[in-house]
């Protein structure tokens, strides 16, 4: 086997207006290496993967795989064949095996022909059996079902043209994994996966024989899969050997030599350090490694790196003792029961993390809490002081030609939030849009930057109960940390739909978990506490992902 499977020599990329997003990157990739790509939003991570996949060839320098290397690429918006159903798209990955199985049956039949050429048939039989054996073709059907369950795919016969963006990504990811290319390039593979599917993907990629290069901000994923971290910092590619925790330790040695540190960053890191030190003994070993996070950003140049040190969640009116009380709630769509007899109370000061498969009804619960939808039966009782601010998952309802400042401020110099007023440019800066960044057009923003604009817009309402639908999607690790700290300092309550287990471990006081057939668990504790309880109560199999089972309406 070649020493390197992929090489980059002095690779650079210029984007409008004449900005070097990548510059002078020279890297070689080992066979079987597992590499996590980290960097701030807009640092060029997706651009790097497009270059490696051969999609973007307008570059400086040279990027090339070893001759004959099979490279598989998952972009953020993958293409599917809409003339085929879900199964048809998945089977594209194993077309050679299916053809070999069909042809092998024909070869067996041809042996019985009076004029059969036994030598030619035996040779072809050997070639076909080699193809089948290489991909475990005799267990093909089981492999398809296991992968479909693990990634919670839609039904096999589902119309691909009607799938949501998340469903399309899961189908594309499943197809790519079944292809088993020698090199996988994955752009945010954990997006639109629930926590159990992410855990399955971790195990799959950890054991994968090929090379994996993955952009992800899932910090447990980076800890459990990556053997290398490739950090993109101001256009440069910096490789670090080790997983996420190891990267933090190594980076500490570089950063601690610098003396300057911003007050906001130190405050942020101290808060996370306190959380790390308070971890249960069962996670002590990992916690010790993660204490290096305290030093990670303490001395780097803030203006150059443009990190999000703080996010600002405007406080609403003072929240009373009664927040949200739900009793005997039921909700169905068609003949599918999404929520069956749900009862829970959100106590004052709680942060409820909501987990479960896509399509289980998590966003539906939010719409019922805001009154946008009505339950089939049951009661939702909100406290008299409750003011809900809802931040939905879909962030495309923005004017692409607006600047950041105009989109957030509605062209007003003053923003009124609750009982106080704030200068609109100062408000934008609290979401880390400072100086000329406020004049960026929405159409030119990265996914994480769009997310921050969306948060800034929706949080102007100044509610004291936040409903956050996948707020962690597309955020870099620095912004994730800032959001965690903002939630921990928020004086009200929050209910947060998220699949980010680190995020849920750090901020959640309660977990709401959507299970099969409309059943929902409500647990006091963070995600790791809940997962431990679930395994102890029901065994390891209960946390293995599978296609969601819906309860049917009784007639």
Language-model-detected regions and their locations in the chain:
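Alpha-helical coupling/stalk and coiled-coil linker elements that connect catalytic or binding modules
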Residues: 272-281, 295, 309-316, 322-325
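ABC ATP-binding cassette signature C-motif
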Residues: 1-263, 307, 313-555
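Intracellular alpha-helical coupling/juxtamembrane segments of multi-pass membrane proteins
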Residues: 250-293, 297-304
